[in-house]
Each structure stands twice: as C-alpha cells, then as structure tokens.
Amino acid sequence: NPTTGSVINFTSAHNIYIDENGIAYIFGLKNNGTWVANRGAVFLDVAANATDPVYLGEWADEYIHDGMVRGDTMYAGCIYQGELYIVDVSDKSNPQTIGQHTTPNNFTHNAWVSDDGNYVFTTDEQSDAYIAAYDISDVNNIQEVDRIQSNPGSNSIPHNTHVDGNFLITSYYRDGTTVHDITYPNYMIQVAYYDSYTGSGDGFDGCWGTYPFLSSGNIISSDRNSNNGKGVLNIYGRAFQQACYLQGNIYDGFTGSPIANANMEILTTTNSETSNLLGYYQSAIVDSG
C-alpha cells in the first residue's frame, strides 16, 4: 500500500500518458512479466522531479490497456471488459467511474476525447473491427453515434486513434495510417491514408503507432514490422483536407410533411443515402468543394 510508505514495483507498463499538469498515468503494469495487482492506472506527479515521482493514487477497478486524460477526466480502454470507461480523477486518491459503454467488438484498445469534450472515439484491436464515435455530453447516457472501418471486409485491425482538431488519425496495422474527417462525429468519413505495409488482412504487421501533434504539422507513424521485417519510423506531410458534407430535409411540397425513405444520390459518385422518418439525410464525399 503506497500510502503507508511502501512502493509499487513494476518493470514495464503497456502505456503512459502525461497530462497538461505533469501527472503521469501508467497503464497496464507488470513486474518481471507478472501483472501487478493494481494494474488499472497509477498516478504519479512527475512535474517537479521526473526521476523521483510522487505517488498520488490509482484506479484499479479494471485492467486499462490504454488511456488519456484531459482536465480531471480519464478516458480508458478496458480491453478485456470490452468497454470504454470514463473516470473522474479530480481526487487522485479516490478516483470515481462516472460512465462506461461497450465498444463494437468488445476489445477496447484505446480512447481519445474530442477537443470540445462532447465526443470520444475508440478502437477495438480485433480483426475487421471498428473505429467508433460516442456522444458523451451526458456520461450517464453515453450513445454510440457512428462506427467506421478503413477497408471493410479486409480483416485489418485498428490500433490507436488520436483526435487532432476535426481529424481522427489512426494507426491501422496492415492498412497503415488513416485519416478521418470528424467534423460531424455521427458521420465520419475517411479522407486520407498511407499504407506503409504491402501485406493486407488480419495480422499485427505494419503501423501500430502514430502521433499527429508536432508543431511542424507533420505526422509520425511507426511500423513494428515493415516489409523487410524491421521497424520503421515514417514521417508524413499533410496533403489531406476536410470532406464535403451534404445534409438536409426532404418534405412533401403539398402537405409539408417529411418524406421518409426517399433516395438521395450525388451524381458522378457512388454515394446513396435514404432519408429517415423526419425526412433528414446526410452524405459526404472526400473531395472538398
């Protein structure tokens, strides 16, 4: 029990996140290959002295594989529970779970919150899995609003996703680095990708990490196993732009009533959408304009 002066011994961890206040959140602890009992998240203050961090507390309700923190809220991928957990960490000595939700493939790898704090995006580290978006404006009633695959039917595996403004940038193993426009989180659209691995399908080769927050605007992505069997660091410029969205309502010209199940097509594209019960439709194409 660290509060009585003893220490938490660990020799490795799956991931670490350091927030804007210099608090390190250590996820998935092991000690010489054995899981540490309190392996959810350990909170350490590394701001004053990174070589002699101060223990602040821990959250040990479930195993956390990966997570991030903004302000007083932790967003955690509890992979073996297959759930997104949202935790109030304002009191590091007594963190409290305030919301949770299952993810599409029940193997929640990571989570990242939108800039406005109203949405969270998750990945499931499974074959043919999804990136998913959730409305968390009410943490007591979290709602999935969209899910998307980079290459449907290919069995590729998403790994880590990051929100960068209106874009979602994801390491996607054998599908490389993918970029989705999330201007409308309920209608994500892929606008760019670079596949650094020649193979396809199920497997843990190719891109397994990406970082889009450099001041240069460049994106760095790491391949754990490139085409020659070695790791590679890739640096990408930003040659992508936001998608073009089309949305509206269809009404009966005589009665003014909404028309459901009306088919809407964007000419010269394969896009086809059907209006809902309120006559609403939404579509998008990659090309801006």
Model-flagged regions — what are they?
Residues 246, 253-268:
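Short, ordered, surface-exposed loop/turn motifs in non-cytosolic proteins
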Residues 1-242:
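Feature marking well-ordered beta-strand scaffolds used for ligand recognition
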Residues 258, 266-286:
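Short, acidic Ser/Thr/Gly-rich low-complexity loop/linker segments typical of extracellular
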Residues 163, 221, 250, 262-264, ...:
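Hydrophobic aliphatic residue packing
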